[in-house]
């Protein structure tokens, strides 16, 4: 699944266009490198979202089969990375 579609599907961003724009300006990182919107993601990958307020990191647990994941089921697909 493309990273922009994944971000929208699990609810980290509201619209896929916004996810694409974030990738274009370098605000989305995948496994430590800047990711283009078309980059494929898989279970076990780490996503970093660079916001003005700071960086949020998530680990992908599995790829959703549904177009949109209900908010109550988001924890099945991503897990926030803990700070050490």
Swiss-Prot record:
Q: Which GO terms describe its biological process?
A: translation
Q: Which terms are listed as keywords in the entry?
A: Protein biosynthesis, RNA-binding, rRNA-binding, tRNA-binding
Domain of life, per UniProt, equals: Bacteria
Enumerate the spans annotated as S4 RNA-binding domain.
1-64
- GO MF annotation terms: rRNA binding; tRNA binding
Q: Please provide an example of a Pfam family that matches this protein in its UniProt record.
A: S4
Give the protein's function: Key component of the ribosome quality control system (RQC), a ribosome-associated complex that mediates the extraction of incompletely synthesized nascent chains from stalled ribosomes and their subsequent degradation. RqcH recruits Ala-charged tRNA, and with RqcP directs the elongation of stalled nascent chains on 50S ribosomal subunits, leading to non-templated C-terminal alanine extensions (Ala tail). The Ala tail promotes nascent chain degradation. RqcP is associated with the translocation-like movement of the peptidyl-tRNA from the A-site into the P-site.
Per the record, the similarity remark reads: Belongs to the RqcP family.
Name of the protein: RQC P-site tRNA stabilizing factor
Protein source organism: Helicobacter pylori (strain ATCC 700392 / 26695)
**Gene name, Swiss-Prot/TrEMBL:** rqcP
